[in-house]
Amino acid sequence: MNTQALLRWLPAALAWAAAGTVCAQGVLVPPAPPAPPQDTLTRAATSVGIKRCLPAISRLSSLTVQGSRSHDVLLDWDRKRPDAGPMFSLIGMQYPNAGVAASITAIPDESGACTVSAERISVAPFTCESVAQQELASYKMTRLLPNYAVYTDAKEPTSSVSLIDSPPGCLIIRRYVEYGWKDPAAVSAAPPPGKR
């Protein structure tokens, strides 16, 4: 075999050898175990025996802590009936330039559904009027007190944003409530009525 032929086949041989090494490593090294849930609330709720509302709690919690540097949770639950009683949580989050708090509540009902609510509480270093103009221009405003206004959007009837003047800034409370929430995965896995 001449030198030119060797040089033509050398890259292919090296690639084949590297691929074999990678495949062999995949066979010899067991796959990593699945990562634990990333948010503290999901881990805490799981550890105390909450199951029925866990998918809703996990969904809300993962959205709530997204982008935070760190977070921790204070959890209250019915210790006699952890999976059948209400769960209340307060989450503290650290962001690069601010601290934020959130509250997530889940209450199971007899039908297997859950009532869930989430509130995210933060402070903006701006006036509430400027926050409303920038973020809530299309929302309907209802003034509850001279320093307290609630904004709603007809497209999201179970959500609201409250702005409370707190000079020199604005206290912002974003709220979401859903009644009769059912896990979409459990609903789609259930057999149709009458076909059991």
Task: Provide a role label for each language-model segment.
Residues L171-R196:
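Short, low-complexity, Pro/Ser/Thr/Gly-rich segments in the mature regions of secreted, periplasmic
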Residues Y95-A149:
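Long, charged/polar, surface-exposed segments that mediate recognition or autoinhibition
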Residues V22-G26:
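Boundary at the C-terminal end of the N-terminal hydrophobic targeting segment
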Residues I50-I57, V116-A118, C128, P168-R175:
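Short, structured motif recognition centered on aromatic/hydrophobic residues
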Residues N2-A13:
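Bacterial N-terminal signal peptides that target proteins for export
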